[in-house]
């Protein structure tokens, strides 16, 4: 628990004591005390509505209760400078600021580990994300899915959870047959044959590149082979090449998976039959019109779902149910899927399946990723200028840089549509939040280099009590918030809060730096304190940037 958390906990304890001392409630009647941080600094450092919560028990007006609590509060023990009553009975606390200096020591001693905690208690969380069909390039929606999933995993890890990243390979459905036919057609075209693409073929540039690679490797070896033999080869070759390309693009995007799970393994190991047997034994299946159905309506779905079609083939739902059973059987405490917005309707049937299989449904969660709209020169970009197809992750990384793509794709909540302005993302100005944040880090690094060149000892002892300017105190409070912010982001699955935090801290840093002089030969003691503060801000920025997977440059 860091110094800010300790201060908050101490204040809660003293409020509790004041309630008892004022005889407003008994021990078992005191509700959980919730402290909020007012957006307006004029309302103090913390505020609580405890007086309103106690009105019925104490049989008094909330403002009178608030006055009673304020009069009985041990301000010294609570590190409170003053208390104000506002509105119908809110209590605003203005804290003594002397404790804030301890934040610097906390940050500098923890170094790269500052912000991390053990709050997750090693709980095992699996996050399955991206999982796009291996049939072409990764596009904008996949890229946002990748950024969100990866940063969510980083947040979980920083908050003390044991995290596993997984990619589910859809390698058993008809899309692999279409992939083989598509690669076959492109291969034959590359060697000069007049062949049309299959009706359901994949048109992307990635398939053309795979075919060119094969021609370079094998020449016309496959031109006269038996069609079935050739198609089997093209399916496997296309699958491996597509997965290799996807993995390469994701790795360059700084996203790496712990486990790549093959859908085919569910068929080979008999896991699908085992899953169907469990559903049948529970009385959750029935036959109608020659098909096998799942009674999902018993669990709140709007209609029952087909598991095995009349032709004997499985629906997409069946292996998906077996896959989720497999996940929970591996011992994860929680499984989280990151899906596109077109999968929203799939959630109720998967919840129904897990309930029917006997698993606690609260172990399963889905995060929906909304669309990305790309803009350039004020116009919406629908197609790539280079390929005439949808803009790929690879193109976007090459065009605007990995840092910018990752930052922007986790800058907003996953359930909000995202407008990505390519011109802004490439600009080196304070209007670009990525540049603005990274410049804050580089600015401190430059200042520290100047300090050394001017003869200041950047490792000198310092007196944090000299940091009394409002902008200094704002920085101290903000860097002290990092650990709890990470815990909250993990609890609420909101990695965009880390990006927001980075921007807010960078804003405070620039405001301070523009208003105050750090290196002052006439006030060496304060200079040493401010250097220490700048080092703590730099470390905090770097740690937060590591979580969202962007670089913290020393020069710009």
Swiss-Prot record:
One GO BP annotation here? Answer: arginyl-tRNA aminoacylation
Q: Which reaction does it catalyse?
A: tRNA(Arg) + L-arginine + ATP = L-arginyl-tRNA(Arg) + AMP + diphosphate
Checking PROSITE patterns in the record gives: AA_TRNA_LIGASE_I (PS00178)
Q: Name one GO molecular function term.
A: ATP binding
Q: How does it assemble?
A: Monomer.
**Which EC class heads this enzyme's classification?**
ligase
Q: What is this protein called?
A: Arginine--tRNA ligase
Where is this chain primarily localised?
cytoplasm
Family, as annotated: Belongs to the class-I aminoacyl-tRNA synthetase family.
Q: Which GO CC annotations does the UniProt entry carry?
A: cytoplasm
**NCBIfam families given in the database record:** argS
- Gene name linked to the record: argS
The residue numbers the entry assigns to motif 'HIGH' region are: 132-142
Tell me where on the tree of life, at the top rank, the source sits: Bacteria
Pfam families hit by this protein: Arg_tRNA_synt_N, DALR_1, tRNA-synt_1d
Q: Which SMART domains match?
A: Arg_tRNA_synt_N, DALR_1
Q: Where in the cell is it found?
A: Cytoplasm
Decide whether keyword Nucleotide-binding is in the record. yes
EC identifiers of the protein: 6.1.1.19
- PANTHER family (alphabetical): ARGININE--TRNA LIGASE, CYTOPLASMIC (PTHR11956:SF5), ARGINYL-TRNA SYNTHETASE (PTHR11956)
Q: What keywords would UniProt list here?
A: Aminoacyl-tRNA synthetase, ATP-binding, Cytoplasm, Ligase, Nucleotide-binding, Protein biosynthesis
């Amino acid at each position: 628990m860091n110094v800010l958390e300790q201060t908050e906990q101490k204040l809660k304890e003293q409020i509790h004591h004041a309630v008892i001392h004022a005889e407003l409630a008994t021990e078992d009647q005191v509700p959980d005390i919730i402290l909020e941080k007012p957006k307006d600094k004029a309302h103090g450092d913390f505020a609580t509505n405890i007086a309103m919560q106690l009105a019925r028990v104490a049989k008094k007006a909330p403002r009178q209760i608030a006055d009673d609590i304020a009069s009985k509060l041990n301000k010294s023990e609570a590190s409170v400078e003053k208390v104000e009553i506002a509105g119908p009975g809110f209590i605003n606390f203005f804290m003594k600021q002397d404790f804030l200096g301890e934040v610097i020591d906390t940050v500098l001693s923890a170094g790269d580990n500052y912000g991390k905690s053990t709050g997750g208690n090693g709980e095992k969380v699996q996050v399955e994300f991206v999982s796009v069909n291996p049939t072409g390039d990764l596009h904008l929606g996949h890229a946002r899915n990748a950024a969100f999933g990866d940063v969510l995993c980083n947040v979980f890890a920083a908050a003390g959870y044991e995290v596993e990243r997984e990619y589910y390979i859809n390698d058993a459905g008809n899309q692999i047959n279409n992939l083989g036919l598509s690669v076959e057609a492109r291969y034959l075209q590359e060697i000069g044959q007049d062949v049309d693409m299959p009706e359901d073929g994949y048109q992307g540039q990635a398939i053309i590149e795979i075919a060119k690679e094969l021609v370079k490797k094998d020449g016309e070896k496959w031109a006269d082979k038996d069609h079935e033999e050739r198609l089997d080869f093209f399916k496997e070759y296309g699958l491996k090449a597509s997965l290799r390309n996807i993995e390469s693009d994701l790795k360059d995007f700084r996203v790496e998976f712990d486990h790549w799970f093959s859908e085919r393994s569910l068929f080979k190991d008999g896991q699908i039959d085992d899953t169907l047997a469990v559903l049948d034994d529970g009385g959750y299946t029935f036959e109608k019109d020659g098909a096998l159905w799942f009674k999902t309506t018993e669990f709140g779905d709007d209609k029952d779902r087909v598991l095995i079609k009349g032709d004997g083939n499985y629906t997409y739902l069946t292996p998906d149910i077996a896959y989720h059973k497999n996940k929970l059987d591996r011992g994860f405490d929680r499984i989280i899927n990151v899906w596109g917005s077109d999968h929203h309707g799939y959630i109720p049937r998967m919840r129904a399946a897990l309930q029917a299989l006997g698993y606690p449904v609260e172990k399963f969660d889905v995060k929906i990723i909304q669309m990305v709209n790309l803009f350039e020169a004020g116009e919406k970009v629908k197609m790539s200028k280079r390929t005439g197809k949808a803009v790929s992750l690879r193109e976007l990384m090459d065009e605007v840089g990995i840092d910018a793509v990752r930052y922007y794709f986790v800058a907003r909540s996953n359930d909000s549509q995202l407008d990505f302005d390519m011109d802004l993302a490439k600009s080196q100005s304070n209007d670009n939040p990525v540049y603005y944040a990274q410049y804050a880090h580089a600015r401190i690094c430059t200042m520290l280099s100047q300090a050394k060149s001017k003869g200041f000892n950047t490792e000198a002892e310092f007196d944090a009590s000299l940091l009394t300017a409002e902008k200094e105190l704002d920085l101290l409070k903000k860097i002290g918030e990092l650990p709890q912010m990470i815990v909250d982001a993990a609890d609420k699955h909101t990695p965009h809060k880390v990006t927001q935090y980075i921007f807010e801290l960078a804003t405070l840093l620039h405001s301070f730096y523009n208003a105050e002089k750090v290196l002052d030969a006439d006030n060496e003691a304060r200079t040493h304190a401010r250097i220490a503060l700048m080092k703590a801000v730099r470390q905090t920025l770097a740690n937060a940037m590591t979580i969202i997977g962007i670089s913290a440059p020393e020069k710009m």
